[in-house]
């Protein structure tokens, strides 16, 4: 069908929902719990479905204060939290029940909409568990708004971080962002200046023992640029980009070639695997890194993330 700038082509699949426009194609999976494919101008941007994130690689200070042991539940939650409910809304009208096969048979190949939202509700593996909701809202121009809500729960340890992780198929050539200069953390903001910055490649701070690094606080926008894909038939090395921008408030982000788990597993830099992916982490909350000493002193109280408090953040994806 012919695409226009004011309509989405909606494809009701057996176990997924497709949204198409003139130069984009998004696939939302009911089984995998989120956005499974994000194609813009024939370039795929996702290697894995984005997932809620509760862990950042621990630091020497974390180990010294025992924080990594106290909050170990969040390490498992980062890996194993499951999506247990999905809500679909098309042009502000709820679609119930969820149109999986054979319920999708009533739809044609010519369904259109101006706005589609999918809310994925995740249950953490913590004891007690809590709920995280990730809501994707797509408009006809291809912009994706992502709103993430963490429901505060008493009797849980403090969080290392809370955010959403995007793993991209190939390594980025670099990224540009508007925010604070250099690496910054909630307790490491002094001396940073606000501006627009470019970072080549995906640098990892060369600590003797790999640990948390590369955070950028108070970010208004970050644009990731790649020049390669996993498509062996794609010989075009022209750079292409995707932008993540704030909505109501700035966010924090890191853009690395490794996940927090990969950094956590390595005890020396040479144990890290070859860089093959881009791991963009968008954070709504980040624990401080401390530094008073590395043999027992905790991060100062204002830089903790209490588990009993709600956390909300949102951002847009556009091209």
UniProtKB/Swiss-Prot annotation:
GO terms for biological process: lactose catabolic process. Signal peptide: none annotated. It catalyses: Hydrolysis of terminal non-reducing beta-D-galactose residues in beta-D-galactosides. Its EC number is 3.2.1.23. GO terms for molecular function: beta-galactosidase activity; carbohydrate binding. It comes from the Bacteria. One of its GO terms (cellular component) is beta-galactosidase complex. Transmembrane segments: none annotated. Keywords: Glycosidase, Hydrolase, Plasmid. Pfam families: Bgal_small_N (PF02929). InterPro entries: B-gal_small/dom_5 (IPR004199), Bact_Beta-galactosidase (IPR050347), Gal_mutarotase_sf_dom (IPR011013), GH-type_carb-bd (IPR014718). SUPFAM superfamilies: Galactose mutarotase-like. Belongs to the bacterial beta-galactosidase small subunit family. Component of a beta-galactosidase that displays activity with the artificial chromogenic substrate o-nitrophenyl-beta-D-galactopyranoside (ONPG). PANTHER family: BETA-GALACTOSIDASE (PTHR46323:SF2). Heterodimer of a large (LacL) and a small subunit (LacM). This is Beta-galactosidase small subunit. It comes from Leuconostoc lactis. The gene is lacM.
